[in-house]
Amino acid sequence: MEGPLSVFGDRSTGEAIRSQNVMAAASIANIVKSSLGPVGLDKMLVDDIGDVTITNDGATILKLLEVEHPAAKVLCELADLQDKEVGDGTTSVVIIAAELLKNADELVKQKIHPTSVISGYRLACKEAVRYISENLIINTDELGRDCLINAAKTSMSSKIIGINGDFFANMVVDAVLAVKYTDLRGQPRYPVNSVNILKAHGRSQVESMLINGYALNCVVGSQGMPKRIVNAKIACLDFSLQKTKMKLGVQVVITDPEKLDQIRQRESDITKERIEKILATGANVILTTGGIDDMCLKYFVEAGAMAVRRVLKRDLKRIAKASGASILSTLANLEGEETFEATMLGQAEEVVQERICDDELILIKNTKARTSASIILRGANDFMCDEMERSLHDALCVVKRVLESKSVVPGGGAVEAALSIYLENYATSMGSREQLAIAEFARSLLVIPNTLAVNAAQDSTDLVAKLRAFHNEAQVNPERKNLKWIGLDLINGKPRDNKQAGVFEPTIVKVKSLKFATEAAITILRIDDLIKLHPETKDDKHGSYENAVHSGALDD
């Protein structure tokens, strides 16, 4: 009779692995929990080479953690997904997912099958999304620009720039509106990547500025070049303009010394011909990711053109998109000849080198294909500037989402409290096992208002109880349905009408975080077996070099 199948590794199954996964998820959530809300605290992360990052952003914290546990990795990837999809709500999505898992584990311990819990969670998530879209949405058209500013301020309130929320909120809204364009379907689009953010340490936060145009952190290649060009025709090149040298390994046998001079002359002429082809199309601004040597700069100075070298590839792509230029990595065409055509040029009203703050920058203004904007951030040190950039990115994404979806929901725990009451009542109408799972889903959502209150040093039990009472009244009594806008005022420690207070979040942030958190919790909940293989050991006859020396294997 054959023995049991042996697996070359560790295997844990059933309740043990489920408890491990829940603990791993809870420990990840506990790391970011204290950073949630307008009075959340920051984290300092030091990597293996000593680089320091100080941040409040959930996605950044989890990205910099080196997590080994596979279930914990799921939550780290979840925060990253929320950051890419929506741009905000990364901390809350992880906290909700961990709480859903914890409560699901309690149910499983009470002998309720994970499949029943999973179907209950899916049903609860679907109902929650439907309830938000039918009852909690505020249309932005009735609120106008103030709504955008308030949504940006809500996003910034927990960040380092929250203290200057009014100043930065206006800057962010202006920047997003400046890069608006209409796509082929006639839909307005707001590409956040078109807003270039530059950082310069020194001065205070409020000396940051918004510039109309794309700001390049470069200067012209030579002092003899013009510093301002009107009606610019821009060539975007992804190669160096330097004297052509023959590749290593190429051997040329010469009998006549004059031939050597001819070869050197031809090397110079190849680059000169390329530059002449570019200038012949009317190009007067040349941007390249590579270098430009002195010989080539001379031709540009004589032609009165502006040449900029060592432009970042990222910046070059954005400028090409904004101006309508083509990025060329070579001038060679399909026939093997080198050509450059006028259609490859981008256009802008003006390209100018200006001194802004303490540095010289090149500004590309009023580009032809799309408009662009740049924000120059000032701060006390590099850590502060980096965190300001992350905060602004979140705020830009929030404003973009509000403009595209044209709807917001009240913040400050209002949505979670309303959903919790609704789902509890909904659970009692279910006559199946899913009832318990839906009730636990409802209880899990209260982790957000609870955490907000705890981080603000308030009595969370008292505050959340009051909040639930208001929302219960709003849902039971149709005459008092305006109470559904009630959320937490964390500074004064009492419930308030967050619609009047202007605490708004994009609807998509709430909807996506609910969906993502539910899916992540379900993914981890389905796991009931973990097999961890042992690392493979190489069958080396002599082992290391030292062992080989001692064994005499190297003597032959």
From Swiss-Prot:
Cell location: Cytoplasm, Cytosol; Cytoplasm, Cytoskeleton, Microtubule organizing center, Centrosome
Protein task: Component of the chaperonin-containing T-complex (TRiC), a molecular chaperone complex that assists the folding of actin, tubulin and other proteins upon ATP hydrolysis. The TRiC complex mediates the folding of WRAP53/TCAB1, thereby regulating telomere maintenance. As part of the TRiC complex may play a role in the assembly of BBSome, a complex involved in ciliogenesis regulating transports vesicles to the cilia.
Modified residues (N6-acetyllysine): K199, K400, K494
Residue positions binding Mg(2+): D88
Alphabetized Pfam families for the sequence: Cpn60_TCP1
Similarity-based family: Belongs to the TCP-1 chaperonin family.
Protein name: T-complex protein 1 subunit alpha
Top-level taxon of origin: Eukaryota
Primary location group: cytoplasm
Binding site for ATP: G37, G89, T90, T91
Modified residues (N-acetylmethionine): M1
Molecular-function GO terms, alphabetical: ATP binding; ATP hydrolysis activity; ATP-dependent protein folding chaperone; ubiquitin protein ligase binding; unfolded protein binding
UniProt EC number: 3.6.1.-
InterPro entries in the record: Chap_CCT_alpha, Chaperone_TCP-1, Chaperonin_TCP-1_CS, Cpn60/GroEL/TCP-1, GroEL-like_apical_dom_sf, GROEL-like_equatorial_sf, TCP-1-like_intermed_sf, TCP-1_chaperonin
Sequence positions that bind ADP: G37, G89, T90, T91, S92, S158, K159, G412, E505
GO cellular component, one term: pericentriolar material
GO biological process assignments: binding of sperm to zona pellucida; chaperone mediated protein folding independent of cofactor; positive regulation of establishment of protein localization to telomere; positive regulation of telomerase RNA localization to Cajal body; positive regulation of telomere maintenance via telomerase; protein stabilization; scaRNA localization to Cajal body
Modification sites for Phosphotyrosine: Y181
Assembly behavior: Component of the chaperonin-containing T-complex (TRiC), a hexadecamer composed of two identical back-to-back stacked rings enclosing a protein folding chamber. Each ring is made up of eight different subunits: TCP1/CCT1, CCT2, CCT3, CCT4, CCT5, CCT6A/CCT6, CCT7, CCT8. Interacts with PACRG. Interacts with GBA1. Interacts with DLEC1.
PANTHER family: CHAPERONIN
Modified residues (Phosphoserine): S6, S544, S551
Enzyme class: hydrolase
Keyword line: Acetylation, ATP-binding, Chaperone, Cytoplasm, Cytoskeleton, Hydrolase, Magnesium, Metal-binding, Nucleotide-binding, Phosphoprotein
Recorded catalytic activity of this chain's protein: ATP + H2O = ADP + phosphate + H(+)
Gene: TCP1
